[in-house]
């Protein structure tokens, strides 16, 4: 049996003391003159419960049949070995005993889903959420685990007495569930393996370039849908397998609906007030027996994200988003026969993957300075209590100051974001500002994709704006389909202007308060945030330096690099993939036609999978003698998954902004070549003609 409480997956350096993160003795902090700062090394080693991209309904946790234990997976990165360590953890829900690791090991299993007609999309880089399944007796867990590139089903004793693979096939297993203590049903797609083998055979004669290709993620055809799912049943005692019956398949496919609950004969669900309008508010609906549905008219019944029924107490509990720009989460209790909800808890931050256990919820919870942990939330009093924290020592570090910002932008839209200031910030001091996009709910780690280290940037002396993208103007209007709304948002880049205007409004607000130096503002972004970087550098004069994790927003990337299938689909959404860069659509975002007008130093930190899409824009900037650098990380995806790369991205981002916004350099000998390149870029910038002002 391994105790999670004393396990120390990685070592870090704090001053001259080398110790293990999560196991730093209290005396070490007490003896120190001051608490140590949050460095990139500390941030990259933080342990995560589940996947980095979890939402309120992501199934992060699994309660035992008797409710006495909760099981979950923890991942911790080690940049020295460049490995992610995975642990399957079991914790008593009463908190009376230490958590134990029932399994340690496995490879990084990428989250991939069918999309755009591909049977399996290219990995985004995020890890798949692994929700363990409890045996009916509560003695074992079954779960997916990848080793040597093969996804199998593993079984572990919940007492920590051992774990081993129990199901392996010629194809990857995609789901598993217990039928009884000795029988498992599982699913996978053997046809996918067969289709890949056919592509391999075809390659001997040469592949025809067609809609199977997505050049941005590789020079190989992708398998297209449909690929049938096969369901098998394994008898653990005899080892025999057979095809699953329809009833057994239904057991595996049955998933709880987070927006549906029963209390006695009353069914509660959520529906839009106008079913034909995709932007109409959602509200709670109750249907008693075979009677007519009754809509709850209370404002508190809108924007519900999760619900649970309690038949014993004749009560419905639900979580919802509320407050300014829906920046808070709240828990409500409502009598099943009254439709009068009462709020019992609310806060900024996130509750994720909640499971109800008697009179409380067990949830993954995070806030601005609190990484994801497990808590219990009392359904009567609303009291929150910690249950399990995989990063217990972070609070002993010298943490920056965080302020929640709210404003109404120039388009009348409610906005929230977070301002993060150095721990020793003195009121009235104007600091250089770094903007990190584009979600600011929960722990302020590295923004979307986790590439721009918020707390270490603040520790380095920057003010950091953790920017939460506003709702689009179109989202307040009536549309009958997402395609129609998307076309409206891309018309004249309407939504991108809304985002840029919001950023400028926030910069102006911080300038008026005397917090920032408006001449030293840096902008970062990944994915949609990268598009905002490209758009912002071309259409605004506010940014003195920028870092982007992908590039670029132009015709080549949208049409050529996305291939025939996706580029055709994008056009339906309002993206003009058949228009050249100098056409009216791309003129607002393309570096190719705007290079001579730009002067902002730009660092592109790209995955090798995506760098080809950056070359037209990067080359145009280079040929125009503009300060730009392209770094390529091998074997990476849209979101970087390798710990060594994440640490390198963290450090280079801080170095870039210190160089351009603070005129500071790191004297470390191994960074000498980096600063030689950057000083050459600075000299190049000083010699180049003045750029054309942005509109």
From Swiss-Prot:
Annotated consequence of substituting residue 527 to A? Loss of activity
Query: Where is it chiefly localized?
Result: cytoplasm
Variant or mutagenesis effect after changing residue 562 to A = Decrease in activity
- The positions annotated as site (Important for activity. Binds to Astexin-3) read 116, 562
Task: Tell me what happens on changing residue 116 to A.
Answer: Decrease in activity
Q: Which InterPro entries match?
A: 6-blade_b-propeller_TolB-like (IPR011042), AB_hydrolase_fold (IPR029058), Lasso_peptide_isopeptidase (IPR053536), Peptidase_S9_cat (IPR001375)
Annotated localization: Cytoplasm
Instruction: Cite a single GO MF annotation.
Output: serine-type endopeptidase activity
Enzymatic class = hydrolase
The disulfides recorded in the entry are 296-301, 354-363, 551-552
Q: Does this UniProt record's set of keywords contain Cell membrane?
A: no
Instruction: Indicate the residues that form the catalytic site.
Output: 527 (nucleophile), 610 (charge relay system), 638 (charge relay system)
**E.C. number(s) listed in UniProt:** 3.4.-.-
Q: Where is this site: Catalytically important residue that stabilizes the alkoxide intermediate. Moves to point toward the isopeptide bond?
A: 438
Which UniProt keywords are listed?
A: Cytoplasm, Disulfide bond, Hydrolase, Signal
Q: Which Pfam families match?
A: Peptidase_S9
Q: Which GO terms describe its biological process?
A: proteolysis
Question: Its GO CC terms?
Answer: cytoplasm
What functional role does this protein have? Lasso peptide isopeptidase that specifically hydrolyzes Astexin-2 and Astexin-3, converting them to linear peptides. Has only a few specific contacts with substrates, because it recognizes Astexin knotted structure (principally the loop structure). Its binding to lasso peptides opens them to expose the isopeptide bonds for hydrolysis.
Show the PANTHER family listed in the entry.
DIPEPTIDYL-PEPTIDASE 5, SERINE PEPTIDASE S9 FAMILY MEMBER
Q: What is this protein called?
A: Lasso peptide isopeptidase AtxE2
């Amino acid at each position: 049996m391994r105790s999670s409480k004393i396990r120390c997956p990685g070592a870090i350096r704090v001053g001259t003391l080398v110790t293990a993160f999560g196991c730093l003795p209290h005396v070490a902090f007490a003896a120190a003159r001051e608490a140590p700062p949050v460095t990139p090394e500390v941030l990259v080693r933080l342990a995560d419960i589940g996947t980095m991209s979890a939402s309120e309904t992501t199934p992060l946790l699994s309660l035992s049949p008797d409710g006495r234990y909760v099981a979950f997976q923890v991942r911790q990165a080690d940049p020295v070995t460049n490995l992610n360590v995975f642990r399957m953890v079991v914790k008593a829900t009463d908190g009376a005993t230490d958590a134990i690791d029932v399994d340690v090991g496995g490879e990084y299993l990428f989250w991939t889903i069918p999309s755009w007609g591909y049977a399996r999309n290219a990995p985004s880089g995020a890890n798949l959420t692994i929700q363990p399944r409890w045996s009916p007796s509560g003695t074992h867990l079954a779960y997916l685990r990848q080793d040597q590139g093969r996804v199998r089903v593993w079984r572990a004793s919940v007492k920590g007495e051992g774990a081993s693979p129990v199901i392996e096939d010629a194809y990857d297993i995609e789901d598993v569930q217990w039928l009884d203590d000795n029988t498992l049903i599982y699913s996978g797609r053997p046809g996918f393996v067969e289709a890949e083998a056919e592509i391999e055979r075809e390659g001997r004669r040469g592949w025809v370039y067609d809609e199977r290709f997505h050049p941005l993620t590789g020079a190989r055809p992708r398998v297209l849908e449909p690929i049938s799912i096969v369901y098998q049943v394994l008898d653990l005692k005899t080892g025999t397998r057979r095809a699953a019956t329809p009833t057994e398949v239904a057991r595996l496919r049955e998933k709880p609906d987070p927006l549906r609950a029963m209390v006695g004969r009353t069914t509660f669900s959520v529906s839009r007030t106008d079913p034909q309008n995709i932007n109409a508010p959602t509200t709670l609906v109750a249907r008693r027996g075979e009677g007519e549905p009754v809509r709850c008219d209370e404002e508190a019944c809108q924007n519900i994200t999760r619900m649970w029924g309690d038949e014993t107490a004749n009560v419905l509990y639900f979580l919802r988003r509320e407050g300014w720009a829906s920046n808070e989460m709240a828990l409500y209790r409502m009598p099943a026969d009254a439709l009068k909800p009462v709020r019992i808890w609310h806060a900024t931050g996130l509750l994720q993957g909640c499971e109800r256990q008697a009179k409380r919820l067990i949830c993954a919870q995070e806030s601005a300075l609190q990484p994801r942990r497990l808590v219990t939330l009392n359904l009567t009093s609303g009291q929150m209590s910690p249950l399990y924290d995989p990063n217990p020592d972070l609070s002993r570090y010298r943490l920056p100051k965080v302020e929640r910002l709210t404003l109404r932008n120039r388009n009348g839209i409610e906005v929230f974001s977070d301002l993060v200031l150095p721990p020793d910030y003195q009121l009235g001091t104007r600091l250089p500002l770094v903007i990190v996009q584009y979600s600011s709910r929960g722990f302020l780690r590295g923004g979307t994709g986790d590439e721009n280290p918020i707390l270490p940037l603040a520790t380095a002396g920057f003010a950091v704006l953790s920017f939460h993208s506003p709702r689009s103007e179109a989202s307040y209007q009536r549309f009958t389909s997402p395609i129609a709304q998307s076309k409206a948002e891309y018309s004249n880049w309407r939504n991108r202007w809304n985002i840029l205007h919001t950023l400028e409004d926030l910069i102006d607000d911080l300038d008026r308060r005397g917090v920032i130096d408006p001449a030293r503002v840096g902008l970062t972004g990944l994915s949609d945030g990268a598009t905002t970087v490209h758009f912002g550098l071309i259409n605004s004069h506010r940014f003195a330096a920028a870092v982007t994790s992908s590039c670029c927003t132009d015709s080549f990337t949208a049409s050529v690099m996305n291939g025939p299938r996706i580029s055709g689909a994008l056009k339906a959404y309002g993206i003009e993939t058949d228009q050249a860069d100098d056409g009216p659509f791309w003129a607002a975002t393309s570096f190719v036609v705007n290079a001579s007008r730009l002067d902002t130093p730009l660092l592109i930190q790209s995955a090798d999978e995506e760098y080809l899409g950056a070359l037209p824009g990067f080359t145009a900037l280079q040929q125009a003698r503009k300060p730009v650098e392209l770094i390529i990380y091998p074997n990476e995806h849209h979101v970087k998954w390798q710990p060594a790369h994440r640490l390198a991205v963290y450090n280079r981002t801080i170095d870039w902004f210190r160089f351009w916004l603070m005129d500071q350099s790191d004297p470390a000998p191994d960074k000498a070549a980096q600063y030689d390149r950057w000083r050459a870029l600075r000299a190049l910038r000083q010699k180049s003609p003045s750029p054309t002002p942005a509109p």
